[in-house]
């Protein structure tokens, strides 16, 4: 083998060696990223749980039966009105699509 072939072989082996070393680094980074992601998820879930518990406690402390009845009444009236208008809109849309027969 000539010196050129030996030099080319050495360069190819050197490049392959760096590729192998470079391929191992992202796997370690992925493991670090997954642990970081897990930590972020756990902290967000703990914040969510504490916020939810605080909101439930506040609701229980300020619960008023008269206000609850008013809210339920408003909900039932608004639901009835919306269902009426949705029915009218559906009939108009069907007659528009169906056309004159």
Curated annotation (Swiss-Prot):
Primary location group: secreted
Family from the record: Belongs to the apolipoprotein C2 family.
Superkingdom: Eukaryota
UniProt GO cellular component terms: chylomicron; high-density lipoprotein particle; low-density lipoprotein particle; very-low-density lipoprotein particle
Organism per entry: Tapirus indicus
Chain residue ranges for the region called Lipid binding: 66-74
Keywords for this protein: Chylomicron, Glycoprotein, HDL, LDL, Lipid degradation, Lipid metabolism, Lipid transport, Secreted, Sialic acid, Signal, Transport, VLDL
Function field: Component of chylomicrons, very low-density lipoproteins (VLDL), low-density lipoproteins (LDL), and high-density lipoproteins (HDL) in plasma. Plays an important role in lipoprotein metabolism as an activator of lipoprotein lipase. Both proapolipoprotein C-II and apolipoprotein C-II can activate lipoprotein lipase.
Protein name, per record: Apolipoprotein C-II
Localization, UniProt: Secreted
Origin organism lineage: Eukaryota, Metazoa, Chordata, Craniata, Vertebrata
Signal peptide (UniProt feature, chain positions): 1-22
Record-level Gene Ontology MF annotations: phospholipase activator activity; phospholipase binding
Keyword Lipid metabolism attributed: yes
GO annotation (BP), single: lipid catabolic process
Posttranslational modification: Proapolipoprotein C-II is synthesized as a sialic acid containing glycoprotein which is subsequently desialylated prior to its proteolytic processing. Proapolipoprotein C-II, the major form found in plasma undergoes proteolytic cleavage of its N-terminal hexapeptide to generate apolipoprotein C-II, which occurs as the minor form in plasma.
Region Lipoprotein lipase cofactor, annotated ranges: 78-101
């Amino acid at each position: 083998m000539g010196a050129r072939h030996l030099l080319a072989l050495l360069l190819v082996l050197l490049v392959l060696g760096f590729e192998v070393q470079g391929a191992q680094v992202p796997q370690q980074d992925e493991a670090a990223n997954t642990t970081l992601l897990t930590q972020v998820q756990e902290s967000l879930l703990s914040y969510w749980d504490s916020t939810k518990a605080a909101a439930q406690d506040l609701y229980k402390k300020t619960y008023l039966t008269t206000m609850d009845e008013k809210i339920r009444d408003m909900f039932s009236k608004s639901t009835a009105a919306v269902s009426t208008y949705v029915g009218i809109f559906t009939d108009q849309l069907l007659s528009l699509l169906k056309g004159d027969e």
